């Protein structure tokens, strides 16, 4: 006798922790009652299922009922046409084209390369071929660098890196809008 009454506990031997907050015993026995009655019902239905199946197949009403529930009702077609396609269209036009693709084109490699190409074209228009123009351009470029590198300790509390980022992003947006 393997089980030796181990699943069964008398109500007088219940511990408070196991009594599931003082529920009545009949409440705890409901799963056993339903399991036993369900098993016996399934066994009895299985015995008469062959007779019921023959009666179901030969009856005109049951045959019509079966064919009614077996046909396609086009719920999936209605859902696809009206709900799913509108969500997919919105997702493609807003999130993909405007946000993802637009941000990648403006801030991604194509936007950066386009910006630098336009900047190089503008700078190349400044070239005249004279040495003193190049010397003057080098002087103009090195003056702020030398000035700010000497004064960085006193200016670092006034300079905010977020403003530099905003300036950089706005220049990309301005270049993108000017090309359109």
Swiss-Prot record:
GO cellular component: mitochondrial inner membrane
Role noted for this protein: Core subunit of the mitochondrial membrane respiratory chain NADH dehydrogenase (Complex I) that is believed to belong to the minimal assembly required for catalysis. Complex I functions in the transfer of electrons from NADH to the respiratory chain. The immediate electron acceptor for the enzyme is believed to be ubiquinone.
UniProt organism field: Zea mays
Cellular localization per UniProt: Mitochondrion inner membrane
Enzymatic reactions: a ubiquinone + NADH + 5 H(+)(in) = a ubiquinol + NAD(+) + 4 H(+)(out)
GO MF term (any one): NADH dehydrogenase (ubiquinone) activity
Membrane topology designation: Multi-pass membrane protein
Protein name, per record: NADH-ubiquinone oxidoreductase chain 5
Gene Ontology BP annotations: ATP synthesis coupled electron transport
E.C. code: 7.1.1.2
Gene name in the database record: ND5
Leading EC class: translocase
Main location: mitochondrion
Alphabetical keyword list: Electron transport, Membrane, Mitochondrion, Mitochondrion inner membrane, NAD, Respiratory chain, Translocase, Transmembrane, Transmembrane helix, Transport, Ubiquinone
């Amino acid at each position: 006798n393997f089980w030796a009454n181990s699943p069964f506990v008398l109500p007088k031997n219940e511990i408070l922790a196991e009594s599931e907050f003082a529920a009545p015993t009949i409440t705890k026995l409901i799963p056993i009652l339903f399991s036993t009655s369900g098993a016996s019902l399934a066994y009895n239905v299985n015995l008469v299922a062959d007779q019921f199946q023959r009666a179901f197949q030969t009856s005109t009403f049951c045959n019509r009922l079966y064919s009614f529930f077996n046909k396609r009702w086009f719920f999936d077609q209605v859902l696809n046409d009206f709900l799913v396609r509108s969500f997919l269209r919105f997702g493609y036009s807003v999130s993909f084209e405007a946000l993802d693709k637009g941000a990648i084109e403006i801030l991604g490699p194509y936007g950066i390369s386009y910006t630098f190409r336009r900047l190089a074209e503008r700078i190349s228009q400044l070239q005249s071929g004279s040495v003193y123009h190049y010397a003057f351009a080098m002087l103009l470029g090195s003056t702020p660098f030398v000035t700010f590198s000497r004064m960085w300790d006193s200016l670092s509390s006034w300079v905010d890196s977020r403003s530099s980022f905003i300036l950089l992003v706005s220049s990309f947006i301005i270049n993108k809008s000017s090309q359109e």
